[in-house]
Amino acid sequence: MDYLIKAIAYDGKVRAYAARTTDMVNEAQRRHDTWPTASAAIGRTMTASLMLGAMLKGEDKLTVKIEGGGPIGAIVADANAKGEVRAYVSNPHVHFDLNEQGKLDVRRAVGTDGTLSVVKDLGLRDYFTGQVEIVSGELGDDFTYYLVSSEQVPSSVGVGVLVNPDNTILAAGGFIIQLLPGTDEETISTIEKQLSQIEPISKLIQKGLTPEEILEEVLGQKPDVLETMPVKFHCSCSKDRFETAILGLGKKEIQDMIEEDGKAEAVCHFCNEKYLFTKEELEELRDETTR
């Protein structure tokens, strides 16, 4: 079962998050029919976005957008404080041979010429936006760079996805480690040593390690778990929302739809759900609109 934990370690000097996201990424793969390299890219992005979302409170939410200039196009993920994530990729049918390390070549798919941006909606008038250049294209390092440079928190992000031969997801998950102000050199060097020795995160999940055990591997000590929360792929789209969008087109455009096709189909970017509007429904919307 997918879930996320929030924890502290080293007498509260280190804040940590870890998650198993296999089912969540599998749902995205199923909905978007992503090929393996695209699955790894969207899965890593969703996992990191989930953990960034877990740092928020209440109704706060955020959107992550990655545009690296690669063949995959843009990757967009929405996450909130409740463990819900949805995401899409411009070109889901992208796959390459494995790279020199024998891993899915996410860097080649994402590209290295572009930006990673995070827009936070904290319920205030203005959104908080942080943007960094893509430094790696492998995404874990890029999210690390975002946290260090945009949020000024020394951090390490690990995200991984393993894909089955039939394109379904074998394992997915990740961790974020953050050093709080006043962390001593000894703690820092211990964690750096641990990070340099651990196996790839997706391998740890494939082996059956829980998020708690993953953090123990990463930190070199048992973390103090503060909160455990279920996580899932969740999209907030609905037919009502698309009705509102159609109303916004105005009478003429709705009339054109009726005359040209006699119906309309709306598809949600984030979850690929399709909503069909019949001729009668379109006529009702046309008569309702004031524009």
Swiss-Prot record:
Under oxidizing conditions two disulfide bonds are formed involving the reactive cysteines. Under reducing conditions zinc is bound to the reactive cysteines and the protein is inactive. One of its GO terms (cellular component) is cytoplasm. One of its GO terms (molecular function) is protein folding chaperone. It holds the Pfam family HSP33. CDD domains: Hsp33. It is found in: Cytoplasm. The keyword Zinc applies. Disulfide bonds join 235-237, 268-271. One of its GO terms (biological process) is protein refolding. Keywords: Chaperone, Cytoplasm, Disulfide bond, Redox-active center, Zinc. Coiled coil: none annotated. Belongs to the HSP33 family. Redox regulated molecular chaperone. Protects both thermally unfolding and oxidatively damaged proteins from irreversible aggregation. Plays an important role in the bacterial defense system toward oxidative stress. This is 33 kDa chaperonin. It comes from Bacillus velezensis (strain DSM 23117 / BGSC 10A6 / LMG 26770 / FZB42) (Bacillus amyloliquefaciens subsp. plantarum). The lineage of its organism: Bacteria, Bacillati, Bacillota, Bacilli, Bacillales.
